[in-house]
Amino acid sequence: MSRKARDPIVLPQGVEVSIQNNEILVKGPKGSLKQVLAPEVVVDIKDREVFVHAAPHVVDRPSRMQGLFWALISNMVQGVNTGFEKRLEMIGVGFRAAVQGSVLDLSIGVSHPTKMPIPAELQVSVEKNTLISVKGINKQLVGEFAASIRAKRRPEPYKGKGIRYENEYVRRKAGKAAKTGKK
């Protein structure tokens, strides 16, 4: 049994969970999310608490699936209640970002501007031209879009230029040592 899944998921005020046709639906103040349940998992709802158990017929991989679905449901509850946010910072001369409609426009030191379509479920905002904020209720979608932005220009280890998560530590390397010595 998964250690996390031993504890119930406590539902905050304003969040409702229902199960229909092997799908779990979580509704809250920020929206609603759906997830198809695996046959190895049984979900019970009692007194504003959600319990995730392994199905009685499963012998092969109950613990893994139980922990996975506990985490997925927990993230869905947190997403519809408070939401998720990833912040990225751009470091480099001339690096800037702008949101134009449903497109994120990045100037990241290449000969052409990089345009990225923003998924409809996310809100992207730019502060100070170099700080990008990605918000949404789906943790996976927020993380994937933030990672795709970062992948356009990952931070390099010599000067640290690039796009990084806020407060991300970038391990720096020493450059080439200057030539010294007599001829």
Swiss-Prot record:
GO MF terms, alphabetically ordered: rRNA binding; structural constituent of ribosome
Domain of life: Bacteria
GO BP: cytoplasmic translation
Coiled coil: none
Keywords: Ribonucleoprotein, Ribosomal protein, RNA-binding, rRNA-binding
PROSITE patterns xrefs: RIBOSOMAL_L6_1
Cysteine-cysteine disulfides: none
SUPFAM superfamilies named among the record's database cross-references: Ribosomal protein L6
InterPro entries for the chain: Ribosomal_uL6-like, Ribosomal_uL6-like_a/b-dom_sf, Ribosomal_uL6_a/b-dom, Ribosomal_uL6_bac-type, Ribosomal_uL6_CS
GO cellular component: cytosolic large ribosomal subunit
Annotated family: Belongs to the universal ribosomal protein uL6 family.
Subunit and interaction comment: Part of the 50S ribosomal subunit.
HAMAP family assigned: Ribosomal_uL6_B (MF_01365_B)
PANTHER family reported in the protein's UniProt record: 60S/50S RIBOSOMAL PROTEIN L6/L9 (PTHR11655), LARGE RIBOSOMAL SUBUNIT PROTEIN UL6M (PTHR11655:SF14)
Function: This protein binds to the 23S rRNA, and is important in its secondary structure. It is located near the subunit interface in the base of the L7/L12 stalk, and near the tRNA binding site of the peptidyltransferase center.
UniProt protein name: Large ribosomal subunit protein uL6
Classification of source organism: Bacteria, Pseudomonadati, Chlamydiota, Chlamydiia, Chlamydiales
Gene that produces this protein: rplF
